[in-house]
A protein has these predicted regions:
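Residue-level signal for alpha-helical context at structural boundaries
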Residues: 44, 114-115, 164
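Loop/turn elements at helix/coil->beta-strand transitions in domains of secreted/extracellular proteins
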Residues: 89-94, 102, 122, 147-154
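Generic hydrophobic secondary-structure packing signal
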Residues: 92, 131, 173-174
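Hydrophobic/aromatic-rich core segments of domains that either
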Residues: 137-176
Length: 176
């Protein structure tokens, strides 16, 4: 229900059957599993009563801008994906990894100010348009590209042990 509301640019969505503490986990799962929702600001507001929670949704871009950005995303992705045509599934994964590793820089500026740079560095837009992102943006882009090739995977959020900064990785599912 929340995912559908986001896709339709609804300002809010009321859900039943969830406790308030489950909403952040649900929102995080939607965020990490749907990199194409780059236009959603996952810093939401929550209104609760005894029987339901209303999630007040926020958007980074309006519908018109999202349509334009989505077309640009498709063009860039098609260019990248054309480089892995004819390869095995494993070769595609490795090639995409190498393409991202060679062409994307870690965004140290955004790392120190994630709220200010979130729309760019934590989404696929940072990688595809600016060639810079933090771990989350890079992992989401890798997932986005793999999913476009019908290779199933997920983004897993974890904490590094040395500095407790958030890091993302992806887990794939398949035969190879």
């Amino acid at each position: 229900k929340i995912y559908a509301a986001m896709q339709n640019y609804e300002p809010s969505v009321t859900i039943n059957g969830f406790v308030e503490t489950d909403i952040p986990k649900l929102m995080s799962a939607i965020n990490l599993d749907n990199p194409h929702l780059f236009f959603v600001d996952f810093h939401y507001e929550l209104q609760s009563d005894l029987f339901s929670q209303t999630v007040i949704l926020k958007y980074i871009y309006n519908k018109a801008d999202t349509v334009i950005l989505t077309e640009k995303v498709k063009k860039v992705c098609n260019k990248i994906l054309s480089k892995v045509t004819g390869k095995t599934e494993f070769e595609k994964e490795l090639s995409l990894h190498d393409i991202l590793a060679r062409n994307v820089l870690y965004d140290d500026v955004a790392k120190d100010n994630l709220l200010k740079f979130h729309a760019r560095s934590n989404t696929i837009l940072g990688v595809l348009f600016y060639k810079t992102a933090v771990c989350e943006g890079i992992a989401k882009t890798f997932k986005f590209l793999l999913n476009a090739l019908d290779i199933k995977c997920i983004v897993v959020k974890c904490k590094a042990t040395d500095d407790l900064s958030g890091n993302e990785k992806f887990e794939r599912f398949g035969n190879t």
